[in-house]
């Protein structure tokens, strides 16, 4: 089985030759109220721009730098919130999974199961996610060459699921540093699945603040523009109304009220990149 070059998630279409789509939301699920506020505002932005949109949030940040780091609301609290976001707001929902058992539990509550970058080669996890029949978004590991994602995608498609997204989120370059090799985007596109560019984790500085990760949100738009100019199916952007006080990944998240202008500029680049 080969991956589908066009993956539809709700009203959003992800394809390397289709108009740009968006995956966006806060790093972690903080509360029901916060989730509805963020999802509602992002949905409104996307609708005004005519942009396909999937809401992302993580119920458990299982790879925090420190044991003391806040990890999110947890699975039990997340399940009804995810279901209500889909039903009441009509937004597709993406969340991370970390174990095989979580895949089946979450399958009825979300639209996309995301494999974290650190776990992208875990065969049992990939197979379990694939067998739910949900769309699977795999973050390319910071340690992985782009051409090696072919084997990752093959584990999912061989398990009977052709609906795969692959996401570039930077590659390790020395200690506490990531860089983005834009060649990875067309290389990954050759695999046949839609390619997403994660603009916010690409500016992360893993473990860069000692007991937490740092980052530099100044460069989110720089990298996002470059990726969209190369040509991608979608962008992945973590955003928060108050990034400096967010429980995780604040240094690399985009201020929520700056999202509309950023998205407008990225859509302009996308139109040029995909013009015939």
From Swiss-Prot:
SUPFAM superfamilies, sorted: Aldolase
Gene Ontology CC annotation, any one: cytoplasm
Enzyme superclass (EC): transferase
One Pfam family linked to the record: DAHP_synth_1
Major place of residence: cytoplasm
E.C. no: 2.5.1.55
GO MF term list: 3-deoxy-8-phosphooctulonate synthase activity
Pathway(s) it belongs to: Carbohydrate biosynthesis; 3-deoxy-D-manno-octulosonate biosynthesis; 3-deoxy-D-manno-octulosonate from D-ribulose 5-phosphate: step 2/3; Bacterial outer membrane biogenesis; lipopolysaccharide biosynthesis
HAMAP family attached to this UniProt entry: KDO8P_synth
Family of this protein: Belongs to the KdsA family.
Protein name: 2-dehydro-3-deoxyphosphooctonate aldolase
Species this chain originates from: Chelativorans sp. (strain BNC1)
Underlying gene: kdsA
